[in-house]
Amino acid sequence: MSGYVGRLAPSPTGALHLGNARTFMIAWLRARSCGGKVVFRMEDLDHPRDKPGAAAAAVEDLRWLGFDWDEEYVQSERRAVYRNALARLDAYPCICSRKDVTSAQSAPHAGEQLFYPGTCRGRFASWDEAAAACAPRIPCWRLRVPDGTTVRFDDAFAGPYEQDVSRTLGDFPLARDPDGAGYTLAVTVDDLLMGVTEVVRGDDLLPATPPQILVARQLGHAPPAYCHVPLVVGPDGRRLAKRHGDTRLAAFRAAGVSPEDIVGWLAYTCGWNAKKTPTRLQSLVGRCPLETIPHEAVVWNGSFT
């Protein structure tokens, strides 16, 4: 087995759909095609949005399509890991609401990230003090970002990417949790400790990458490589949602669609099949180059044929 370690990281906030399946397929094939390892991680820290039964359903859907993995983790069982990592970071509690942050800067243009000016830097001695000051709201942890902090990396699919984090984001949020059990901190720590060598995910998460790289560096580690691939969208160009019909993998299975039909269509959208031919996932191992994947979003028109 090579030293490559990839990961599949679904969240139980909803059912897996075609877009998830395409990204996971690329991630899985990147690992298996070089004899690498696949880590499965359930990212279940967003408890208010978690759907009952969604975690088990995600495992069932992926197994049905032909996925397998070598290690399995659940983030909600790893709070002590995140707490220990948080203690090593230059982080502080912040009580500013989104409205506070927005009003502290000139009006951002659509799509721009919010810049945080450091209002709560040095303001509170502890999380508990901050929590008392903003009750019943919950504070968040922010990472202190020194002036002149720019992150540059080469994405395996999207190419060179650069962001001056100190000027565009400022001290960015890590987690809204006393133990640091939130997305930015948790995924970064887990990727490091699980030995993930490349993160393959949707290109909507490309802007989330520079903060994660900074967290990794503050923890004294080199970050993994990254590969951000286009999403599957509806005919209106917007990411898949109920307005585009039922694109849940479970719904296709219930309707009698075979896993080979789905994998074949996904392979066709990646340029790995010349036609929308039913295909087993395992048969794509070793014939899944990134170079044939279009750089535009994939449009789902409602049919696998």
Mark where each language-model region is.
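Alpha-helix initiation and N-capping motif
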Residues: 55, 79, 98-101, 113, ...
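Short alpha-helix boundary/capping motifs
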Residues: 89, 111-114, 244, 280
